[in-house]
């Protein structure tokens, strides 16, 4: 699997800005080998937008039931029909979600043909009390599905939108903790990822991708991150071929 770059737009961006953003990405696609997943608000889903092969659309949530009387919710099957291939689950900004509910959502997503990106991460209190390992193990045990393909996103809650990022050793250790909980190899990092710190993050050998929040809203900033990723893997591939 290629290096995964996920853009979480949260509740930002009108459909017109999304169409413009995707158009710019399509124009640059011959320069990009990474897998890009753009997660816009539901209102921007691409009913008639042409996407190049390395660009996928993801949702920011889905319900844990296929259909039913759940006002204001959207099912994984509906997302699939709209053209989604990924769905992000368990983000800390989705307040008060239970771990068991996140697990049900991930399983119904897989059953519906979506690839879930399941978020795990400790809050500031757990981080200060050195309970990160304990929290991550518990979340993995209770959030991750028992079958199918998925990606785990380590996103420490205290790092989201703060500009603060754990040091590389700390991130690498958490990735190893997650790997002991699952046979899946696709583990990405999220939390204040930007063009200023992506080069440093790319030196983490067991990192499979990044989850980007506010830095993905501006195309130029987002593309700077992509360029640094491409440069890194171009150099690696060059060394391998030589």
Swiss-Prot record:
It is an enzyme of class 5 (isomerase). Keywords: Cytoplasm, Gluconeogenesis, Glycolysis, Isomerase. GO terms for biological process: gluconeogenesis; glyceraldehyde-3-phosphate biosynthetic process; glycerol catabolic process; glycolytic process. Pathway: Carbohydrate biosynthesis; gluconeogenesis; Carbohydrate degradation; glycolysis; D-glyceraldehyde 3-phosphate from glycerone phosphate: step 1/1. Gene3D superfamilies: Aldolase class I (3.20.20.70). GO terms for cellular component: cytosol. Its EC number is 5.3.1.1. It comes from the Bacteria. The active site is at residues 91, 155. The keyword Cytoplasm applies. Pfam families: TIM. SUPFAM superfamilies: Triosephosphate isomerase (TIM). Substrate binds at residues 8-10, 161, 192. Its main location: cytoplasm. It is found in: Cytoplasm. InterPro entries: Aldolase_TIM (IPR013785), TIM_sf (IPR035990), TrioseP_Isoase_bac/euk (IPR022896), Triosephosphate_isomerase (IPR000652), Triosephosphate_isomerase_AS (IPR020861). It catalyses: D-glyceraldehyde 3-phosphate = dihydroxyacetone phosphate. GO terms for molecular function: triose-phosphate isomerase activity. Belongs to the triosephosphate isomerase family. Involved in the gluconeogenesis. Catalyzes stereospecifically the conversion of dihydroxyacetone phosphate (DHAP) to D-glyceraldehyde-3-phosphate (G3P). Homodimer. This is Triosephosphate isomerase.
């Amino acid at each position: 699997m290629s290096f995964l770059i996920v853009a979480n737009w949260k509740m930002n961006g009108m459909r017109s800005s999304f169409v413009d953003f995707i158009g710019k990405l399509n124009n640059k696609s011959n320069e990009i080998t990474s897998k890009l997943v753009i997660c816009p608000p539901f209102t921007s889903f691409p009913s008639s937008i042409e996407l190049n092969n390395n660009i996928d659309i993801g949702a920011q949530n889905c319900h844990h039931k296929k259909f039913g009387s759940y006002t204001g919710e959207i099912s994984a099957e509906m997302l699939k029909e709209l053209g989604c291939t990924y769905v992000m689950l368990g983000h800390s900004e989705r307040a008060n979600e239970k771990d068991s509910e996140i697990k049900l959502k991930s399983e119904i997503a897989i059953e519906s043909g979506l690839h879930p990106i399941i978020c795990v991460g400790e809050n500031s209190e757990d981080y200060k009390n050195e309970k990160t390992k304990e929290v991550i193990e518990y979340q993995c045990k209770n959030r991750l599905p028992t079958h199918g393909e998925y990606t785990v996103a380590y996103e420490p809650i205290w790092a989201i939108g703060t500009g603060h990022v754990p040091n590389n050793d700390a991130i690498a250790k958490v990735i190893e903790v997650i790997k002991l909980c699952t046979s899946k190899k696709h583990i990405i990092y999220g939390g204040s990822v930007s063009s200023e710190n992506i080069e440093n993050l790319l030196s983490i050998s067991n990192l499979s991708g990044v989850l980007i929040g506010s830095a993905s809203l501006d195309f130029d900033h987002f593309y700077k991150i992509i360029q640094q990723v491409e440069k890194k893997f171009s150099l690696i591939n060059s060394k391998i071929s030589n």
